[in-house]
């Protein structure tokens, strides 16, 4: 038996994040809450979300179950709701029923065995910066019409994001005093595909800050919390493979 009640805003943000890399996802529901891990078909980006039961206004799960869903179908349900509403979710055999005020809609579940849950790689780095989401977004937006990649540089002095083409270039500089925290004793550099980052930053609009971690030509790790619910937060992890440059 699964019965949940969650704000439409939280559900939309979860769905928007997943839709940046996958069209189908498998959720694990147990006594602690709900979690999902997904990787895009090209194995370039991965997302991990942990939704503690405290995020839900109602939460009941008898044991551990897996729920596999088409993300577009989930988004079609969310479009029926007002952003200030809550949505009730109940598993009924092979369907998931959504109650939104005086509207109810059932969506067929997918076979969970057809969706592989990826293993999260151990790519921890001791180098990181905690950056305001709004500052990070400005750096990405400055680069989006210049190149399809962006280069990050982290040092003891701060964080830089640069992009260039034959005719244009952009640079965002965040000195140490503009960062919430910084841990870096060296100068490290790595480039990443901009398309994935632009989709990601748009989907995490409620996050206040991002913990960005990487090494030279190494996968990028971004840890964040979604802040729609002041009493409990959704914990997220975004991983992105580097773009190797000549």
From Swiss-Prot:
Main function: Sliding clamp subunit that acts as a moving platform for DNA processing. Responsible for tethering the catalytic subunit of DNA polymerase and other proteins to DNA during high-speed replication.
Protein name (record): DNA polymerase sliding clamp
Organism encoding this protein: Thermoplasma volcanium (strain ATCC 51530 / DSM 4299 / JCM 9571 / NBRC 15438 / GSS1)
Gene3D superfamilies: 3.70.10.10
Subunit structure of this chain's protein: Homotrimer. The subunits circularize to form a toroid; DNA passes through its center. Replication factor C (RFC) is required to load the toroid on the DNA.
PROSITE patterns, alphabetized: PCNA_1 (PS01251)
Keyword annotations: DNA replication, DNA-binding
GO MF, one annotated term: DNA polymerase processivity factor activity
Family designation: Belongs to the PCNA family.
Biological process according to GO: leading strand elongation; regulation of DNA replication
């Amino acid at each position: 038996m699964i019965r949940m009640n969650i704000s439409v805003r939280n559900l939309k943000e979860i769905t928007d994040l997943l839709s940046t890399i996958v069209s189908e996802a498998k959720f694990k529901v147990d006594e602690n809450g709900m979690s999902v891990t997904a990787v895009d078909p090209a194995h370039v980006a991965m997302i991990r979300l942990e939704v503690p039961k405290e995020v839900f206004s109602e939460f009941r799960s008898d044991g551990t179950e897996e729920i596999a869903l088409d993300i577009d179908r989930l988004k079609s349900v969310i479009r029926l709701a007002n952003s200030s509403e809550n949505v009730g979710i109940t598993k009924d055999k092979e369907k998931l029923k959504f109650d939104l005020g005086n509207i109810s809609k059932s969506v067929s579940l997918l076979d969970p065995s057809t969706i592989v849950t990826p293993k999260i790689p151990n790519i921890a780095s001791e180098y990181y910066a905690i950056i305001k989401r709004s500052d990070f977004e400005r750096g990405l937006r400055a680069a989006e019409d210049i190149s399809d990649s962006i280069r990050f540089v982290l040092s003891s002095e701060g964080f830089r994001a640069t992009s260039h083409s034959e005719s244009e270039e952009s640079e965002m500089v965040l000195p140490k005093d503009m960062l919430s925290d910084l841990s870096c004793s060296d100068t490290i550099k790595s480039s990443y595909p901009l398309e994935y980052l632009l989709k990601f930053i748009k989907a995490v609009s409620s996050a206040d800050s991002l913990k960005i971690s990487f090494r030279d030509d190494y996968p990028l790790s971004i840890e964040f919390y979604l802040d729609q619910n002041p009493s409990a937060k959704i914990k997220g992890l975004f991983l992105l493979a580097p773009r190797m440059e000549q």
